[in-house]
């Protein structure tokens, strides 16, 4: 299979596939006599795992670790589960931070009259000027 076939099947771009190869995140493909990369089902599995791991929030390094676990016949599902639950905890923390930012912005918006005057508690609060406090 060539890189364009793999790109179509995995939903990755050829550029992304080459990038993952350069970073050592996938098994290096064999080269044909003409120098073209030749991919196997193993490559499809690794690249699909990388794409899907990235989609659910794993960073590049973590995704590579999952590929290593995928290729390790001695892996323990407990390791994969632990990493997944750690990622869930990270995402939950990020959600809490986003909710806090949302609440702050809503409080600022509620404090602003939103009329034609120049007085804007949002700008004043964000700039630290004039000691206006929202909410």
UniProtKB/Swiss-Prot annotation:
GO MF entry, a single one: DNA-binding transcription factor activity
Gene3D superfamilies: 1.10.1660.10
Annotated compartments: Cytoplasm
Keywords per UniProt: Activator, Copper, Cytoplasm, DNA-binding, Metal-binding, Transcription, Transcription regulation
Xref: SUPFAM superfamilies: Putative DNA-binding domain
GO cellular component, one term: cytoplasm
Gene Ontology biological process terms from the UniProt entry: positive regulation of DNA-templated transcription
Residue ranges for the DNA-binding region feature of this UniProt entry: 4-23
Domain of life of the native organism: Bacteria
Residue span, HTH merR-type domain: 1-69
InterPro entries attached to this UniProt entry: CueR, DNA-bd_dom_put_sf, MerR-type_HTH_dom, MerR_fam
CDD domains: HTH_CueR (cd01108)
Residues annotated to bind Cu(+): 112, 120
Pfam families xrefs: MerR_1
Function: Regulates the transcription of the copA and cueO genes. It detects cytoplasmic copper stress and activates transcription in response to increasing copper concentrations.
Record comment regarding domains: It contains a N-terminal DNA binding region and a C-terminal metal binding region.
Quaternary organization: Homodimer.
Protein name: HTH-type transcriptional regulator CueR
Protein's organism: Escherichia coli O6:H1 (strain CFT073 / ATCC 700928 / UPEC)
């Amino acid at each position: 299979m060539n890189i364009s076939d793999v790109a179509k099947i995995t939903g990755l771009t050829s550029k992304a596939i080459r990038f993952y190869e350069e970073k050592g995140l996938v098994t290096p493909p064999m080269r044909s006599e003409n120098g073209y990369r030749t991919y196997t089902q193993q490559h499809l599995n690794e690249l699909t795992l990388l794409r899907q791991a990235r989609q659910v929030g794993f960073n590049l390094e973590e995704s590579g670790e999952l590929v290593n676990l995928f290729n390790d016949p001695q892996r323990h599902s407990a390791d994969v589960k632990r990493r997944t639950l750690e990622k869930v905890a990270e995402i939950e923390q990020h959600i809490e931070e986003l909710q806090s930012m949302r609440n702050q912005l809503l409080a600022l918006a509620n404090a602003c009259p939103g009329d034609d005057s120049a007085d804007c508690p949002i700008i004043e609060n964000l700039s630290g000027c004039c000691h206006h406090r929202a909410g």
